[in-house]
């Protein structure tokens, strides 16, 4: 009987310990495990959300990059058009200036030619008068007249 009473008390202590563990020890442990499980689940969800946010950010970056490339391309084309326009305008202005300078030079040359002709005419008239004067002062002689004409030619 002594053995039976020991087993009985051991069983009673075991059941009390089991009840005590189930009532007071086990709930905080399960609560701590559930909280830890929830933290892990929240962490995984946050990681998935972070991945999704990263994918969205990368998509936005690629859109912004494409937009910037197209905008830069448009700006480059516009700058090239503007440069071509400026070059063409400068070419037209230079051509107009060249035409004006050529016209002015032609006009100056024509005036100079006219002055030279007028001066030559005056010189020829003066020489003709001088020659006629010398011819009239001398007697009529073909050799003398030829000599005077040669002198006039030399003066021209």
Curated annotation (Swiss-Prot):
Signal peptide: none annotated. It is a single-pass membrane protein. GO terms for molecular function: proton-transporting ATP synthase activity, rotational mechanism; proton-transporting ATPase activity, rotational mechanism. It comes from the Bacteria. It is found in: Cell inner membrane. GO terms for cellular component: plasma membrane; proton-transporting ATP synthase complex. Keywords: ATP synthesis, Cell inner membrane, Cell membrane, CF(0), Hydrogen ion transport, Ion transport, Membrane, Transmembrane, Transmembrane helix, Transport. The chain crosses the membrane at residues 7-27. The keyword Transmembrane applies. Belongs to the ATPase B chain family. F(1)F(0) ATP synthase produces ATP from ADP in the presence of a proton or sodium gradient. F-type ATPases consist of two structural domains, F(1) containing the extramembraneous catalytic core and F(0) containing the membrane proton channel, linked together by a central stalk and a peripheral stalk. During catalysis, ATP synthesis in the catalytic domain of F(1) is coupled via a rotary mechanism of the central stalk subunits to proton translocation. F-type ATPases have 2 components, F(1) - the catalytic core - and F(0) - the membrane proton channel. F(1) has five subunits: alpha(3), beta(3), gamma(1), delta(1), epsilon(1). F(0) has three main subunits: a(1), b(2) and c(10-14). The alpha and beta chains form an alternating ring which encloses part of the gamma chain. F(1) is attached to F(0) by a central stalk formed by the gamma and epsilon chains, while a peripheral stalk is formed by the delta and b chains. This is ATP synthase subunit b. It comes from Bordetella petrii (strain ATCC BAA-461 / DSM 12804 / CCUG 43448). The lineage of its organism: Bacteria, Pseudomonadati, Pseudomonadota, Betaproteobacteria, Burkholderiales.
């Amino acid at each position: 009987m002594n053995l039976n009473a020991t087993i009985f008390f051991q069983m009673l202590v075991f059941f009390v310990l089991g009840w005590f563990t189930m009532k007071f020890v086990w709930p905080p442990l399960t609560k701590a495990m559930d909280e830890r499980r929830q933290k892990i689940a929240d962490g995984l969800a946050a990681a998935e959300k972070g991945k999704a946010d990263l994918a969205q950010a990368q998509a936005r970056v690629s859109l912004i990059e494409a937009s910037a490339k197209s905008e830069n391309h448009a700006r480059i084309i516009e700058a090239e058009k503007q440069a071509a326009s400026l070059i063409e305008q400068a070419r037209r202005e230079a051509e107009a200036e060249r035409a004006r300078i050529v016209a002015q030079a032609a006009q100056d040359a024509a005036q100079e030619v006219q002055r030279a002709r007028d001066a030559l005419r005056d010189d020829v008239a003066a020489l003709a008068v001088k020659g006629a004067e010398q011819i009239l002062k001398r007697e009529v002689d073909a050799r003398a007249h030829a000599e005077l004409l040669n002198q006039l030619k030399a003066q021209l």
